[in-house]
């Protein structure tokens, strides 16, 4: 029954993989990633300014204004900045389809998108200048609109050579200025015209009009059915091997960050912060320890199973999963595409958000009002993100208990299956090494096997003799760090000239030329054909990995070095 259900879901995999590679969704996601330092930096000052209130201490008005200035001058302009970063990401995608000698200037598209955004989102101030009410999270949807219109217009002009052409004697930097003039002017004229039409028709700017238009959708998304569909999709997509956040996050990004600010303003006014769909809800409630709400799963594998294999997987996965990097348990157990874990993997995140919604709406707990790094451990993220309230401590404990209850019966079934397999066969030398290597100590693995008189082909000298720089890419930079660290550690142990770095897909365009090999983690393997256009143009090797294969490489540094070597032998 479960196998048939999974088979039906997998039939839609090609469509959803294509959707996850959509250049507009990708531009939104990458635009936010580029702006993340601003978002996280501003949250530090929110915590300093308002967390003391919980303990009865309040800053005076002057000090509060000093602490809030960095927030207002960064997060208060986030939509303005995202207009530029989104335009840059979309420009990179369009440039892949253009000749290398006729590319869109991303600096110009960023400038045009940001200038165009000001027309759509800002109102003139009485004393000169302009107002910034819609330049923060309220203007995010308008930022996307400005970025998309800008790059589409530039692509139209550049592709058809609708530009001012200068004589060959003119220096390239001067020639580029005139080449950008027509598309830049066209963008500003189009967006200014849109601004005039909306202002004269509805007596508001475009940003305010878009916000009113989507307000019913935002309200519906915050309801029981809305949160179930949205956050259930995260786990459902990941279960069949599709990186769910690549599809879902861009669709809800504007809501999540707008709700964070709305909750903060409610708290400032002494009211109840009740917006459910926020970035904190996604990172610390729904993906409590990673997609599938897997924070408790490695501990359960360690302490509640009898299988040696499962205990080893739990030990190897517990630390990264605690910080939200749960690929070791997803692909090591595995949880994804494993019929036994389908129900808890999809159900646990949904139940978590239901419980959170109950705490907020019935018990009066405040929702998230601060943005935190996604690698913050789940329980700590809940407590800090909701203002250190008493209910936040109760909620964190409740989610841990409930998730254990949800996963436990399915874990026992799976553990029984693995026990039967272990009892039916003898452990091979390769199994022994894999378990020792699961502790991330390749040198120790080699010494144990050598002491046992076991030949070890993995310890052979590497054929890599020249300096090789490797870039490992995943969705956000966390999972890629596992393999990059394993490569660097093994390279140092075996004196191999390999240096590896971790990065997030989408933020790689400007640095990839510094590397000889790029490895795609399973999260972003579906983007292989897209990035191959760039690597082929630059003469860089490209490799993609599957789930179990990737986890094995992160645990066995020598195997990871061999994998790198194989890419240059093919």
Curated annotation (Swiss-Prot):
* Gene3D superfamilies for the chain: 3.40.50.2300
Induction pattern: Induced by lactose, galactose and galactose-6-P. Repressed by glucose.
The UniProt record lists the keyword Nucleus: no
Catalysis performed (reactions):
lactose(out) + N(pros)-phospho-L-histidyl-[protein] = lactose 6-phosphate(in) + L-histidyl-[protein]
The GO cellular component terms are: plasma membrane
> Where would you find the membrane-spanning parts of this chain?
31-51, 65-85, 104-124, 133-153, 178-198, 223-243, 283-303, 340-360, 382-402
Chief localization: membrane
What is this enzyme's EC? 2.7.1.207
Which intervals of the chain form a coiled coil?
A: none
The molecular function terms of the Gene Ontology recorded here are: kinase activity; protein-N(PI)-phosphohistidine-lactose phosphotransferase system transporter activity
Supply one GO BP term: carbohydrate derivative transport
What InterPro entries does the entry give?
LacE, PTS_EIIB-like_sf, PTS_EIIB_2/3, PTS_EIIB_3, PTS_EIIC, PTS_EIIC_3, PTS_IIB, PTS_Sugar-EIIC/EIIB
**PTS EIIB type-3 domain spans which residues?**
467-570
| Phosphocysteine: modified positions | 474
Membrane topology reported for the UniProt record: Multi-pass membrane protein
Q: Which UniProt keywords apply?
A: Cell membrane, Kinase, Membrane, Phosphoprotein, Phosphotransferase system, Sugar transport, Transferase, Transmembrane, Transmembrane helix, Transport
Q: What does this protein do?
A: The phosphoenolpyruvate-dependent sugar phosphotransferase system (sugar PTS), a major carbohydrate active transport system, catalyzes the phosphorylation of incoming sugar substrates concomitantly with their translocation across the cell membrane. The enzyme II LacEF PTS system is involved in lactose transport, but can also use galactose, isopropyl beta-thio-galactopyranoside and thiomethyl beta-D-galactopyranoside (TMG) as substrates.
The record's annotation in NCBIfam families points to: lac_pts_IIC, lacE, pts-lac
Return the PANTHER family for the record.
PERMEASE IIC COMPONENT, PTHR33989
This chain's protein is named PTS system lactose-specific EIICB component
């Amino acid at each position: 029954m479960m196998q048939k259900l999974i088979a039906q879901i997998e039939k839609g995999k090609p469509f959803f993989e294509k959707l996850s590679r959509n250049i507009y969704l990708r531009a939104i996601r990458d635009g936010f990633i580029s702006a993340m330092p601003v978002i996280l930096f501003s949250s530090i000052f929110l915590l300093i300014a308002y967390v003391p209130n919980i303990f009865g201490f309040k800053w005076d008005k002057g000090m509060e204004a000093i602490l809030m200035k960095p927030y207002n001058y960064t997060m208060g302009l986030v939509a303005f900045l995202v207009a530029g970063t989104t335009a840059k990401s979309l420009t990179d995608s369009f440039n892949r389809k253009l000749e290398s000698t006729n590319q869109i200037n991303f600096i110009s598209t960023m400038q045009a998108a940001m200038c165009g955004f000001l027309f759509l989102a800002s109102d003139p101030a009485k004393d000169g200048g302009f107002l910034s009410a819609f330049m923060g999270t309220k203007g995010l949807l308008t930022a996307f609109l400005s970025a998309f219109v800008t790059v589409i217009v530039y692509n139209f002009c550049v592709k058809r050579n609708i530009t001012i052409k200068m004589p060959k004697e003119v220096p390239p930097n001067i020639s580029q200025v005139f080449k950008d003039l027509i598309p830049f002017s066209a963008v500003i004229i189009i967006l200014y015209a849109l601004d005039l039409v909306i202002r004269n028709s509805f007596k508001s700017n475009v940003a305010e009009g878009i916000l009113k238009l989507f307000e019913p959708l935002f309200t519906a998304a915050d309801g029981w059915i809305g949160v179930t569909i949205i956050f259930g999709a995260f786990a459902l997509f990941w279960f069949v091997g599709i990186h769910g956040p690549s599809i879902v996050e861009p669709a809800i990004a504007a809501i999540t960050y707008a709700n964070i600010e709305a909750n903060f303003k409610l708290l400032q006014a002494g009211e109840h912060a009740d917006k459910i769909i926020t970035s904190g809800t996604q990172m610390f409630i729904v993906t409590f320890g990673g997609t599938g709400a897997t924070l408790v799963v490695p501990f359960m594998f360690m302490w509640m199973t009898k299988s040696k294999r499962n205990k080893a997987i739990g030990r190897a996965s517990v630390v990264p999963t605690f910080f939200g990097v749960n690929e070791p348990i997803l692909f090591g157990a595995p949880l994804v595409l494993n019929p036994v874990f389908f129900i808890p993997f999809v159900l646990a995140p949904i139940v978590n958000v239901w419980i959170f919604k109950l705490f907020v709406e019935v018990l009066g707990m405040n929702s998230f009002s601060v943005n935190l790094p996604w690698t913050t451990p789940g329980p700590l993220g809940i407590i800090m993100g909701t203002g250190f309230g008493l209910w936040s401590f109760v909620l964190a404990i409740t989610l841990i208990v409930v998730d254990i209850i949800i996963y436990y019966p399915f874990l026992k079934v799976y553990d029984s299956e693995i026990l039967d397999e272990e009892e039916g066969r003898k452990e091979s030398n390769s199994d022994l090494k894999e378990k020792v290597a699961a502790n991330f100590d390749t040198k120790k693995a080699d010494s144990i096997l050598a002491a046992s008189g076991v030949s070890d082909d993995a310890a052979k000298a590497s054929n890599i003799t020249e300096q090789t720089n490797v870039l490992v890419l995943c969705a956000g930079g966390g999972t890629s760090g596992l393999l990059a660290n394993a490569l660097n550690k093994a390279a140092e142990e075996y004196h191999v000239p390999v240096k590896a770095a971790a990065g997030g897909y989408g933020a790689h365009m400007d640095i990839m030329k510094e590397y000889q090999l790029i490895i795609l983690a399973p999260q972003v393997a579906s983007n292989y054909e897209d990035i191959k256009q760039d690597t082929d143009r630059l003469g860089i090797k490209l490799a993609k990995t599957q789930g179990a294969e990737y986890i094995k490489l992160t645990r066995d540094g020598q195997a990871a070095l061999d994998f790198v070597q194989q890419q240059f032998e093919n």
